[in-house]
């Protein structure tokens, strides 16, 4: 009897492999999203309009996946995994298993920004994030935007905003774009191309707080600069979701294996 906690891409592939190795075993998959597994990097493509909604779900819909792989989907929030007891505790009770796999993934990380209204703050990782972002863009009430984080997700959000004709600033505390993914020489070439599209780049700086006066919203930066900002995209990074196994396994920036 197997339990898989989390049903993103990793959870999906784990379930497929378990079923391949054990044709008869019971597999319970815990997921509180109610959605098929999806690729978080595809959410910006949907927001841009390059993908239809279904395109975010590369493995098909839930009904199709369940039919192909044969598992039980339990739409419950897992509260705690008790490793020594082989127990999964949920909001509705608990269940014992022979083997438990943790595939909870990560969530977007965003520190609070003083003065930033919730309706003007946008993350970009989940399907819900993409739907919310797209709905706001349809209102045509955004003239200026600030995106924090010169990451892959950040530049894709900038691309979406640029498509809608929104004047956009991309900020990062690092000294150049894609600091974790590109050599400085390559990054500088990318920066030239991004700026050629009319995007403003600012490095070594981030947002300090938001101010609003007479309906005009302004992002005040850590160097004192002031930028008009109707919305703020927070693409700073992710944090591993480890709450369910706290105290049960060794945890660093994620689960240590």
Sequence positions of predicted segments:
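Residue-level detector of alpha-helix initiation sites
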Residues: 8-12, 34, 106-108, 128, ...
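Phosphate-coordination loops involved in phosphoryl transfer and adenosine-cofactor binding
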Residues: 1, 75, 139-144, 204
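FAD-site-proximal beta/loop scaffold in flavoenzymes
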Residues: 117-138, 218, 226-257
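Core beta-strand elements of the Rossmann-like FAD/NAD(P) dinucleotide-binding domain
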Residues: 90-99, 222-231
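Glycine-rich dinucleotide-binding loop and its adjacent helix/turn
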Residues: 104-164
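A conserved short coil-to-beta-strand element within the FAD-binding core of flavoproteins
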Residues: 75-86, 203-215
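Rossmann-like dinucleotide-binding cores of NAD(P)H-dependent redox enzymes
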Residues: 144-145, 152-211
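Beta1-alpha1 glycine-rich phosphate/pyrophosphate-binding loop at the start
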Residues: 1-70, 158-181
């Amino acid at each position: 009897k197997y339990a898989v906690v989390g049903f993103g891409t990793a959870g999906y592939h784990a379930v497929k492999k378990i079923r391949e190795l054990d044709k008869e075993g019971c597999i319970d998959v815990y997921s509180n999203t109610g959605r098929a597994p999806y690729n978080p990097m595809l959410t910006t493509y949907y927001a841009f309009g390059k993908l239809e909604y279904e395109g975010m779900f590369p493995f098909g819909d839930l009904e199709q996946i369940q039919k192909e792989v044969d598992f039980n989907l339990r739409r419950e929030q897992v509260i705690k995994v008790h490793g020594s007891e082989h127990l999964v505790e949920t909001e509705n009770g608990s269940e014992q298993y022979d083997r438990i796999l943790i595939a909870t993934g990560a969530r977007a990380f965003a520190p609070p920004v003083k003065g930033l209204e919730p309706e003007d703050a946008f993350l970009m990782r989940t399907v819900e994030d993409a739907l919310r972002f797209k709905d706001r863009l349809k209102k045509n009430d955004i003239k200026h935007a600030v995106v924090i984080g010169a990451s892959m997700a950040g530049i894709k959000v900038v691309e979406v905003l640029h498509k809608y004709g929104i004047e956009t600033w991309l900020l990062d505390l690092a000294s150049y774009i894609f600091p974790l993914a590109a050599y400085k020489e390559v990054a500088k070439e990318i920066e030239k191309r991004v700026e050629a599209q009319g995007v403003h780049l600012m490095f070594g700086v981030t947002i300090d707080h938001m101010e609003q006066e007479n309906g005009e919203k302004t992002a005040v930066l850590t160097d004192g600069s002031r930028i008009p900002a109707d919305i703020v995209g927070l693409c700073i990074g992710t944090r591993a979701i480890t709450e369910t196994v706290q105290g049960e396994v060794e945890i660093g920036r994620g689960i240590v294996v």
